[in-house]
Amino acid sequence: MVIEGYKFSAPPLLLGVVLMALEWYWLGGLLLFLGAFVLYFFRDPQRVAPADPAAVVSPADGRVVEIVDEPWQGKPGRRISIFLSVWDVHVQRAPVEGRISRVDYRPGRFYAALRARASAENEQNVITIASPRGEMMFKQIAGWIARRVLCWKAAGENVALGERVGMIRFGSRVDLWLPPEAEILVRRGAHVAGGTTIVARWQ
């Protein structure tokens, strides 16, 4: 459980208990259900990263909605976009082992996460990881519901494959940029699990 889950679930749960004691069952039950859903949303299950040293794992749970050629900082590469619904785990994980070379927060808009312009224009954290095999970048992108992106790591920190690095609240999108040296193994429409699903492999 992510610590924010207790903070957001406590008010509706406590108020729900009080209302149930006062025999306001309908409203009390609704608040208890809301509090339970918040606890479910902020769940943080244990994940075991694959032992494959050439693996690139998904940074997030969700559905692959786009795979496109896209340069980054003048370098050729491909982008995998993953949509997180409110039912998915919202903790993001390191796609590769390495050192975080940059964390750039970019303020922006709050378009729906499925819109193509969300990748470029929405509020986001851009996290760059320098791994022994090459550099990789992924974005935590806010949406029209998810208006807070949290990165728990700082530039200069080392991360293990599949290690927790941050979270997006209440559904949004994560983009993963891969250099040509990484062979993409997933297709559009595939459901992926953060820290465990191998989405690419270093060649």
PLM regions with names:
Residues M1-Q203:
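Contiguous, well-folded functional domains in the mature portion of proteins
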